[in-house]
A protein has these predicted regions:
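Exposed extracellular interaction/assembly regions and N-terminal maturation sites
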Residues: 1-9, 14-100
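Short, surface-exposed terminal/edge motifs of secreted or surface/virion proteins that either
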Residues: 30-38, 98-105, 121-135
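Residues within well-ordered beta-strands of beta-sheet-rich folds
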Residues: 91, 119-121
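Surface-exposed loop/edge segments in extracytoplasmic proteins
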Residues: 108-110
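Tight coil/turn sites that cap or link beta-strands
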Residues: 114-117
Length: 863
């Protein structure tokens, strides 16, 4: 029985009933036929030439259609296929290690690089036989053509072209690097380069253009010279002639385009009707499909810009974005149905699903976020950023909303600004409002001209003309108007209070209905509830609740006041502890600092009256004036450190630096002049007017000192000194009266002296009960007592004598130690020095007397 053993599974008859010589020959031939269609390997020797001969009637690897060349060539080798009359096709694979040239005769050869594969045919023409690469078409090189008329007969120098299909690339002459797959693909191309045409009629009319890619039936079918186009899809760019640099992906995309360039269309019928419009981008089913001649539009998404005809510079990204736009310019819509019904509205921007979805003719709007400005129809120049921002706005213009549902209920309210989630979200018709921050002005509906900046600033507001800057500033305000709050929680509790100004953290925090208050500084007027208070500074008037018409300026000024009214505190900690007292004025750091219930006080200067707690009706002007006063009332202290140490003393007046500085509990003193009554502590009812008047007086009373240095050293009581340094040295002398410059100037311990006139009793130290009236009267007296001198120079030289009486100018002018003399008249007893018991009445009476016991009455008697 016959067997089936060869590679072609042909019947071999050498066995069975057909065996015999003929059967054996037949078997051999059948095996050789099978070998011809199989794979064979020929080993090449390392030489520059070699021959592979197909043997007659015997098995031979050279007979195989797929012949592999092996070996280890170190040089190029020319292999001759023999015999030269053999006409056959081989697929030769070169693995011999170097370049192999396949030859048969003197005709053409085929060069196969190491590792290369070539399909060759030997023409068997004898000595002139040639080897041809069956895939190297006509005159070019590296070309592949499959199909009737593929690459035709015109190709001369074109290289590396591929044509598959009837008449594909059939007109090409010198074109290179083209690929045409499909009937008539690139059928008219002559010199064009780097084209790819896949599909029947693709790039059919292209002649000289280059760098086109067409995939699909009739894709780019009419293009002649337009280059750098890409068309993927049946009829894509099928009307294009000279337009270049276009991209069309999808059936009918850019289907009407003729000469326009630089368009991109991705999607069925995208840019379908475009003819000459350039630089358009359409991505999505029917995107920009009505666009004809306008340029610079971008439509990405189903029906994006689908109705656009002449509008340019538009951008639409998202299904149905700018779907109804026809002639409008410069719009940007990104998101599902963004600017969907817009027709002629220009220069709008919508980013987000339904952003500006109902806008028709309005222009210059910007919407970013889901449904932002979603209901807007004709409102212009609005800006909305955030989910639902301005989503109810219809016709209002010039609004700005940034944040989740910012201005979300606004319909016709114009010129509002809302930045922050739910900012101004209830506003409907209110205008000129500004809300910046989460829920800022969120309850405002129809009110206008409010400004709220900060978390929940003016959150509950329904009033107008309010300004709030800071977290929760004016948060609970309802109908209050004309309020200004700057700082976290400033005026946070205000409901109906109007005309308030609060600047600073917690300023006017508790105020709800109080009006016309002004608070500048953290916690200023924090607990205020009433009207017309003014506070500037940290914690100024912080505790004030119902007190009104107060003014507090300075850190912690008037801090603890509760119900006190009509007070003024200016300076850090001024009137800090005041609680219920009224009508106080404190100006200066710590002025009236500890005052609680004391009223009608005036303190001007740092530390002035700073220890006073319940004292009233005091006036302190100057640094530390009345600084230690606690309960002393009705004092007046003007000057640095004046009445510095006074605690309970009342009814004192101190004018001048350090005047009455050491006074503690005494009352009814008057000190006018620097250091007047400076050391007085408990002495009362003293009056000192002049620089250092009564300076050292401490505990004594009822002294009067008028003039610089008067009673400077005094520590006694009941003295009166008027004049420069009058009674200047007096210490313990009491009940003296000195009027005139240097009067009783040296007096120390003497008492009951009276001196009127310049230097009267000027040298007196311990002499007591003297009376001197007139300039230089008793001027030299030191210890003499019970003397009377009336008249200029009377008893002027008297030193220690006592009991003399001299009345008249120069009376007893020379007397020094004489006693018990009486001289009345000009120059009476004027020569007497040491004698005693004389009486002289009359001008110059006893004028020359120097003896004792004389009596002279009359002009110049006994002279």
């Amino acid at each position: 029985m016959a067997t089936y053993v060869n590679d072609l599974r042909l019947k071999e008859i050498a066995t069975g009933d057909e065996s015999g010589t003929w059967g054996t020959s037949t078997n051999t031939n059948l095996e050789l036929i099978g070998e011809a269609f199989s794979v064979g390997t020929e080993a090449l020797s390392d030489a520059s030439t070699g021959t592979i001969t197909v043997q007659d009637g015997t098995s031979d690897a050279a007979r195989s259609m797929n012949m592999k060349l092996s070996g280890s060539l170190s040089q190029a080798c020319t292999v001759t296929l023999a015999p030269n009359t053999l006409s056959k096709v081989w697929c030769i694979e070169n693995n011999a290690g170097d370049v192999v040239t396949i030859s048969q005769g003197t005709g053409a050869n085929v060069v196969i690089p190491n590792g290369g594969i070539r399909m060759v045919v030997a023409d068997g023409a004898g000595s002139g036989a040639a080897i041809t690469d069956v895939l190297d078409v006509l005159g070019g090189t590296g070309n592949i053509a499959l199909g009737s008329g593929a690459m035709g007969v015109a190709l001369t120098t074109g290289t590396d072209n591929v044509a598959i299909g009837e008449n594909a690339l059939d007109a090409v002459t010198s074109g290179t690097d083209n690929t045409a797959v499909g009937d008539n693909a690139l059928g008219a191309d002559t010199t064009g380069q780097r084209h790819v045409a896949v599909g029947s009629g693709a790039l059919l009319l292209n002649t000289t253009a280059s760098n086109n890619t067409a995939v699909g039936y009739n894709a780019l079918t009419t293009t002649t010279t337009g280059g750098d186009n890409t068309a993927i899809g049946d009829f894509s760019l099928d009307a294009n002639t000279t337009g270049g640099s276009n991209v069309a992906v999808g059936q009918n995309s850019l289907g009407a385009n003729t000469t326009a360039s630089q368009n991109t269309a991705v999607g069925v019928s995208a840019l379908l009707l475009n003819t000459t419009g350039t630089r358009n981008v359409a991505v999505g089913y029917t995107a920009l499909d009505a666009n004809t001649t306008v340029s610079d539009n971008t439509g990405v998404g189903y029906n994006a810009l689908t109705a656009n005809t002449t509008g340019s510079n538009n951008t639409a990204v998202g299904s149905q974005a700018l779907e109804a736009n026809t002639t409008a310019l410069n719009n940007t819509a990104i998101g599902y149905k963004s600017l969907e019904v817009n027709t002629t509205g220009a220069t709008n921007t919508g980013l987000g699903s339904y952003a500006l979805a109902l806008n028709t003719t309005a222009s210059y709007n910007s919407a970013v976020g889901y449904n932002a400005l979603g209901a807007n129809t004709t409102g212009a120049q609005n800006t909305a950023v955030g989910y639902g921002a301005l989503d109810a706005n219809t016709t209002a213009a010039n609004n700005v909303a940034v944040g989740f549902e910012a201005l979300s209920a606004n319909t016709t309210g114009a010129s509002n600004v809302a930045v922050g989630s739910a900012a101004l979200d209830a506003n409907t018709t209110g205008t000129y409002n500004v809300g910046v921050g989460y829920e800022a002005l969120s309850a405002s509906t129809t009110t206008s001209q409010n400004t709220g900046v900060g978390y929940r600033a003016l959150k509950a507001n329904t009033g107008s003309y309010n300004s709030a800057f800071g977290m929760s500033a004016l948060q609970t305000n309802t109908t209050g108007s004309n309020n200004t709050a700057v700082g976290r929680d400033a005026l946070v509790s205000n409901t109906t209070g109007a005309n308030n100004t609060a600047v600073g953290y917690l300023s006017l925090y508790t105020n709800s209905t109080g009006a016309s208050n002004t608070a500048f500084g953290a916690e200023a007027l924090e607990k205020n509830t009433t009207d017309s208070n003014t506070a500037f500074g940290y914690q100024a008037a912080e505790e004030t609740t119902t007190g009104d018409f107060n003014v507090a300026v300075g850190a912690s000024a008037f801090e603890d006041n509760t119900t006190g009214a009509q007070n003024t505190a200016i300076g850090g900690y001024a009137l800090r502890n005041n609680t219920t007292a009224n009508n106080n004025v404190a100006v200066g750091y710590l002025a009236l600092d500890v005052n609680t219930t004391g009223a009608q006080n005036v303190a001007v200067g740092a530390y002035a009256l700073d220890a006073a707690s319940t004292a009233s009706n005091n006036i302190a002007v100057g640094y530390r004036a009345l600084s230690q006063n606690t309960t002393g009332n009705e004092n007046v202290s003007i000057g640095t450190d004046s009445m510095l140490d006074n605690t309970t003393g009342a009814g004192n007046v101190a004018v001048g630096m350090e005047s009455l500085a050491n006074l503690t509990t005494a009352s009814s003193n008057v000190g006018v002049g620097k250091q007047a009554l400076n050391t007085t502590t408990t002495g009362a009812s003293n009056t000192a007017v002049g620089f250092q008047a009564l300076r050292l007086n401490a505990t004594t009373h009822y002294n009067v000192a008028v003039g610089t240095g008067t009673l400077y050293n005094n520590v006694a009581s009941n003295n009166t000194a008027v004049g420069f340094e009058a009674l200047n040295d007096n210490t313990t002398g009491a009940s003296n009266v000195a009027v005139g410059a240097y009067a009783l100037d040296a007096n120390t311990t003497a008492s009951n002296n009276v001196a009127f006139g310049k230097s009267a009793l000027g040298a007196n130290t311990t002499g007591a009960t003297n009376t001197a009236l007139g300039g230089d009267t008793l001027a030299a007296n030191t210890t003499g007592g019970s003397l009377v001198a009336i008249g200029y120079n009377a008893l002027a030289a008297n030193t220690t004598a006592s009991y003399n009486i001299a009345i008249g100018e120069n009376a007893m002018v020379a007397n020094t130690t004489g006693t018990d003399n009486v001289a009345v008249g000009y120059g009476a007893l004027d020569a007497n020095t040491t004698t005693s018991y004389n009486t002289a009445v009359g001008k110059n009476a006893l004028g020359a007397t120097v003896a004792e016991g004389n009596t002279g009455v009359g002009r110049e008697a006994l002279s």
